[in-house]
């Protein structure tokens, strides 16, 4: 009998790991807390289980929802392995380490360390006021640096948002949801499009649109603005119809340094060609402003405006 997208029961053995509990569910995966039976370490396991394509059979096997979806499920599973293999080759303090990946139950599993800390989205919900400039720089400069490494290796994350940023001790950030990461030179599987309202730019809503590092840049800008205002920006499709979003440099003037507001506005340009081409471009533009900010010589908004961002 095929069941709906049911999680595996606590105590289930998958490879060399014993599952403890489900700790998350996404559009394409189930996430478990588990124990490594060889080392005793606590780990996090992501199971490839796209809710629009897959069902669970008795015994734990993952099968397509219908015969028509078999090819898409197979293709998605193959891409899952290719993408995890690519990520395993990257080493960065803000990119989660891949400990293991394997095939079981006719699907793929990704094993990661269980990092202690808190989720940025949850942290924002608990705060009564906005966050400081220092906090934003501590979190998002390393995130941009991690994305820059991915972009240099022709990979894009495609789902950067506060809910996918984990804060460790000292607010050291860790990018989560590696299952959304996609190599630029590979075709996207049907049903694999990730869209998060408020953080996904307009090109991400259309299957034939070209995605690239600039797609991640928009999401970073939207995430920073969420931290500043404690609310999610309007969805890109709404902005495409009628852009009522007031620029950050106008809406938040005096609350944050001009250079940071300009960076947010540049990153959140509706047209991809008007954004920084990748995370490195935005980071390179930010660096001299960061140096001046840390020494107390903060530039004004007018002086710091990047090319392509118009004053309103």
Protein language model features and the residues they cover:
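Protein kinase glycine-rich loop
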Residues: 20-26, 31
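Activation-segment/catalytic-loop signature of the eukaryotic protein kinase fold
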Residues: 101
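AlphaC helix of the eukaryotic protein kinase fold
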Residues: 58-89
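Activation segment signature within eukaryotic-like protein kinase domains
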Residues: 139-140
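Conserved short submotifs of the Hanks-type protein kinase catalytic core
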Residues: 105-119
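AlphaC helix of the protein kinase catalytic domain
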Residues: 120-131
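Protein kinase catalytic-loop region centered on the HRD/HxD motif
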Residues: 143-155
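C-terminal lobe helix-coil module of Hanks-type protein kinase domains
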Residues: 198-294
């Amino acid at each position: 009998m095929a069941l709906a997208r049911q999680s595996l029961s606590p105590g289930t053995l998958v490879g060399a790991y014993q599952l403890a509990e489900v700790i998350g569910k996404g559009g394409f995966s189930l996430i478990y807390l588990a124990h490594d039976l060889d080392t005793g370490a606590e780990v996090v396991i992501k199971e490839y289980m796209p809710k629009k394509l897959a069902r669970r059979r008795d015994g734990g096997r993952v099968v397509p929802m219908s015969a028509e979806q078999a090819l898409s499920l197979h293709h998605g599973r193959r891409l899952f392995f290719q993408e995890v293999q690519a990520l395993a080759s990257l080493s960065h303090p803000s990119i989660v380490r891949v400990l293991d990946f394997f095939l079981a139950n006719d699907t793929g599993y990704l094993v990661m360390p269980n990092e202690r800390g808190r989720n940025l989205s949850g942290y924002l919900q608990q705060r009564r006021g906005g966050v400081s400039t220092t906090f934003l720089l501590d979190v998002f400069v390393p995130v941009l640096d991690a994305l820059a490494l991915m972009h240099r290796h022709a990979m894009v994350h495609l789902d950067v948002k506060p809910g996918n940023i984990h804060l460790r001790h000292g607010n050291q950030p860790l990018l989560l949801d590696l299952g959304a990461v996609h190599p630029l030179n590979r075709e996207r599987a049907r049903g694999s499009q990730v869209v998060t309202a408020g953080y996904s730019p307009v090109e991400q809503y259309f299957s034939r649109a070209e995605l690239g590092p600039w797609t991640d840049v928009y999401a970073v800008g939207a995430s920073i603005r969420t931290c500043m205002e404690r609310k999610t920006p309007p969805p890109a499709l709404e902005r495409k119809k009628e852009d009522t979003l007031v620029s950050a440099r106008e809406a938040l003037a005096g609350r944050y340094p001009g250079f940071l507001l300009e960076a947010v506005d540049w990153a959140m340009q509706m047209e991809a060609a008007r954004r920084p081409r990748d995370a490195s471009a935005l980071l390179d533009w930010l660096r001299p402003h960061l140096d001046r900010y840390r020494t107390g010589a903060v530039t004004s908004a007018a002086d710091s405006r990047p090319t392509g961002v118009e004053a309103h």
